[in-house]
Curated annotation (Swiss-Prot):
Single GO MF descriptor: GTPase activator activity
The protein, known as: Uncharacterized protein C18B11.11
Cellular component, GO, one term: nucleus
Species of provenance: Schizosaccharomyces pombe (strain 972 / ATCC 24843) (Fission yeast)
Pfam families: DUF3384, Tuberin
InterPro entries in UniProt: Tuberin-type_domain (IPR018515), Tuberin/Ral-act_asu (IPR027107), Tuberin_N (IPR024584)
GO biological process, one term: negative regulation of TOR signaling
Amino acid sequence: MKALDIDTILTQISNQQSLDKRYKRIKRLINNEQFCKNVILQKLVDSTKDIIENKVHGNILAATISLWTHAAEKHKEMSSDDRALLFNELSKVPNSEYYPATVDALIVITSQGERTESFSNDILKVLSEWLTDLFTIIDDMRAQSRKSFKGSAELRNYTRCFRQIILLLTNMFRVGFNLFDEMEVSSMLANCVWVSKSTTDEEDIALVFSLLNCIISYGRISSAVLYSIVEVVCRAKFGLVASSQSAQQIVEKLLKTATKYEALNSLKRIMEETDEGSYIAIMGGIQIVSALFTDIPRSVYCTRGMLLGFLQRSLKNKSSRIALETTRSLYNALERRSFVEVLYADEWISLLDLLVEISSSLPKSLNYRPGTWQHIEPNIIESIASYQLQHLLLFNEILKPDSNHFVLEKFHEFLKINFSYLTPTLSQKLFTVLDLRSQLPYSEGWLEDQTILLKSYFDTSFSLDFHVYLIGLFRKVLFACPVELRPEVYARMLCPLVKSLDKSSSEVIIDEVISLVCDLSWIYPSNVFHEVKDSLCFYAHNSSNGDLQLRSIQAIVSLTFYYVLLPEFKSVLYDGLVEISCDFKIRRTFRIPVLKLLLQLRINTNDYCFVNLSPAQLELISVYSTQWHNPFISEEAQRCRDNKVKDRDLSFSPVFQKFPLKVNTSATLSKDLMSLPINEWVKNVMYIVTHETDWKVVQYILINFTNQLRNTKMFTKTVEALQLLLNSLRDIINGKQSLNINFSDFFRIEDLLVSLSKILSVLMVYKDVLPPTAHEQFFQLLNRFAEKGDKTMESCIDTLITNCCAMQSFSIMHLPKFFSITMSSNLSERSLVNFLRLLHVVSDNWELNEGLEKETIQSICLFCLKVIRTKKEELDGHKKLVNPNTKVFCLYLVSFSYSIISNLFLGCETTERAQLASFLLKEFLNLKNGSHFEGYERVFYELLLRYTYSDERIESYPSDSRFHFNSSSKSWLYRGCVITINAEYETGDYQMILRRMSGTTIYRFWRNMRDRGAFEKSLMMEQSMVSSELKQKYLQEIAASHVFMETVLSPLDSPDEEPILIKPDARTEELIQSLDATHTKPVINIAVALQAGDVSDINTTVGWQLFYRLLESFGHEKKLDNGETIYVWQSKTIEMIFRYVSDPAEALESSLYSSLIIIGSDDLVGPDSLNWDSVDVPVIIKISLDSHLDALKMFDTLFHVKLEIITTGTDISHQSFWKLDQIISTNSIAPLLHSYLADIGLYQMIFENFAYVHPWLLRQQYIDTLYTIHQVPTTQRESSALPSDKTFDFTLFL
């Protein structure tokens, strides 16, 4: 095309033409390649620029821009002036409607960047402005397009233009970044940031990020806009998945630029933002930081600890969303295992600290802080918990037992805090850790561990076995707890455990918790003990769960009796047991065993508390003990009980040195001593007796409470309780207090009265404690009981025997009535003996004797004479056959009655003695009725005659030296009872047993009267104690065991009675003196001789060897110091010594023998085989054996034996000829002789006792009288032949 043509065309499109013509012509020229290629751009612009300058709207403007664009495209080598000209005109486009066409033109203009250097900043500025304008338009159009489908083509056009601008900018920066001014670049970037924040279109953001990448790659971003760029990148990182990788790359590139530290600081600032509008950026930043955490940038100094610090700062926003993003991003990052191996310990700890803080957003976590997190939504919480659990599983797999200790500790803390969300595997891991940490109370977080255990225990989702396992952990923790933490830890752990028992139906759980309570008892803080005790008592009284009620009662019992606690705690427990024992709301099978234990409670004379393990009449309540198996017993107590250790002394073991079980028996209060609620106990016992319906239970209570009352140390200081007991007995016997006992075949009112009378009998022991007004009440009750029957009367008699002398004024006042009631009753044999003992005690006491009125004395004498008459008639009525035991018993009562009459006679006033003597002589002679006097009757007759008109007072005379008694004997006969002293020289204790026909009483003395120093030394050696403090404090307590396993054995012949424990003080000495136990029984010496013929006849008669075999059967062999051999046989009441004598006549002259036994063959032991004139013994026993036996081999076979027992005088008790003519075994002879000789010894003791209890007669006179009885003069021994009418024959069958 020619130049003329081009000019013509330019004229046609110039402003000289109308707009329509110009538009039509320009529109045709757009596609005219020749024109576009040859036209001069400056002329073209000059011809049409008025359209843009004048802002002519319409299609012509768009057509003009298109024409320019095509012409520029055809000019491949445009000069910079042409480019500048085009840009200057295009930049004047009036509005955004023409931006798409204009941008296409600008793309062509800037296709060669080096030719736009002069106006590149202008281009950047224009494009930046257009960018914001276009985005505003696009954003509005997008909002409208959501409401309708109109304008979609226009929107696409603008969107394409908008993205082309970004691409154009990207290309311009890539070609010549150095051409641009920093301020313009920053302005443009600010607009890009604004666009990125305002759009959600991923492609738009991708193009912007591409621009940012280009700028970062080819140039430098200003610090002014750096923060905004980092923020928008963080937003994109979180919000758009497609741009996430680009955002990460942008940050990584920024950390490699010159502004890397500013970029890092910008990232930090973003994490510290607190505005809610920044949450998206923060969460994106969390993702970026988490990604950097796995791959630390090397171009900048940035540690993992710093990055974790960024994450830590982000949590200050208190946003649960941020917490979720943090734990999620970290977990995604940690899935790359390779980098985990290179983490340092401090990095691990920082990481775990961060996760621990995130756990505070979980409501079930241990460190949960309500109100800390905002916008809490259930799904967010669940997601956080899920990711935390994933972290735990990951760490559990990564961390090994040999990992860093501090890291493992922090991991365990993280595990512990999230225990509510753990899987079974992690739970097992956690509790394994807690089990190991339970023994480390000083480690950090130890108290938090216990909170976990407690929460786990109360989580019902766990199994029963797991709960039992947790209780085992509680045991370890509580035992390991330091002293200073016990009040807090025990109150926080143990008390809730105990209080939760009422919600548990499992017997295993109840047993485990109660066992834990008992085992921990010795280290209880005060506040915990009282809280636990209150809970147990509440369950005992109010629980509807039978198992829990039983176990609670057993726990209180165990803590009281089988565990060591502070004395003040023990006192409280005793109070609780007393309340349980009388609470009738508690079922009987649970209540009775508690009552039984309390009845077994004792205090020894050193004030130590123990339990008598041998209660009387246990079979009465055995039915209530079937369910009572107490499993809560301390190991030491169990060991003692299993081994059945008697009197085991544990007082020197360390635990008892700290807490001795010593009872406060004084009126002052002391924290170091236990206090027993004696007053409440006595009150409750009487309450139970009056309200209990089962007679067997009441009977058991009365029997054992009587035994307990014998423990004087327990009740001596409780005057109020004793008075209450006395008043209760009075109300019951007088009918003021009714009983609820169900009448049955087993219940008789007499048995109840007897039991109550025994209580009254023991109460008399406390007569010195009670006020004098109670003494009269004693006698009034005794008279009331005596009126109720023979059984109660016997108990009353026994009571008066030991107490009437101590309360003389009241005895004188009330005894006459008691005597009258008793003597008018039909007394049994036991009661008769007992009553005679009482009369003897009264008659032997001067004050009581003188206080009796004449009528009373006469009635007593008549009663005794009636007894004498009855027993003499019984003896005479048997004619030939008389049982030796019956004979001895009758003679005992006769002699005793004479002694009582004698004492009463001697004790009366001298002015009344003549009248009384006349009365007694008359009655005595009427009694004899012409029969001959026995020896003792002659003594009594002479007594009456001698003192009828004399006022000589009775005096004591020394014992005659001719009476030699065995000093090692331990028995005395006193007032009709045998007193036996059993000494335990190893322990320094001894007991005195009073055996009488009506029963047995035992007094136990807890110290020996021998050298204390030697005893203490021996005790110290036995105990091997070296502590000086222990020696000073405890070695003075010389006693049997003071702990709970001490046993007091009841006497075998009186199983219902226990010893009365007495301390050997002044009162003990008075008791011994009042018993008058000073006369020992003589040992019965028996001579044994062999009657043999000539030596040549030794083989045809009984040989010496056979004789010694028979002698050995009499008793055990014993060698004396002088070389003599004797044979000793002992029983409970007698001791016999058999001595071989070669010459009976000579032996009997030098010593006093009770009997002579002659053994020989039947041909040698005959009526004339012995010179009777030389025999000075009361009894001769002849044993003759068959003369045809001569070998030892025949000793144990049956053969013919003749046995003769011959009395040498007129001894009425044995005035008989015993003859045994029978085939028996020779070894049966010994028991036969033992029985017979024991009767002889008992008979002798009666007479010698009768002599002793009358000290007003000269001893020599009684010796003469004794020999007179046996018809043996002291100066000349005369032979006495047995009168035939006084000989009785009978045969004894073995």
